[in-house]
Regions:
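A short, Lys/Arg-rich alpha-helix, primarily the initiator
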Residues: 1-13, 51
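Short acidic DE-rich linear segments
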Residues: 65-68
Length: 68
């Protein structure tokens, strides 16, 4: 699962800045930045929050074969 793509796509679809998205998830701006740049992956609890938001906003969590 490509969390950097998912986090950025979700945040963009929600029309939020990294700071606003960080507040919504209860993490720091730096954490969102690290996720989007692929330096770190979200911990399990944050992955669950992201998955719920992805479902709400119609974002696929798994990559399709043609996207690989």
């Amino acid at each position: 699962m490509n969390f950097s793509r998912i986090v950025k796509e979700l945040r963009t679809k929600m029309m939020l800045s990294q700071i606003e998205f960080a507040k919504k998830l209860g993490v720091s701006y730096a954490t969102i930045n690290r996720w989007e740049n692929g330096h770190h992956k979200p911990v399990f609890n944050d992955q669950r929050k992201i998955a719920k938001l992805c479902k709400k906003y119609g974002i696929e969590l798994e990559e399709k074969e043609e996207d690989k």
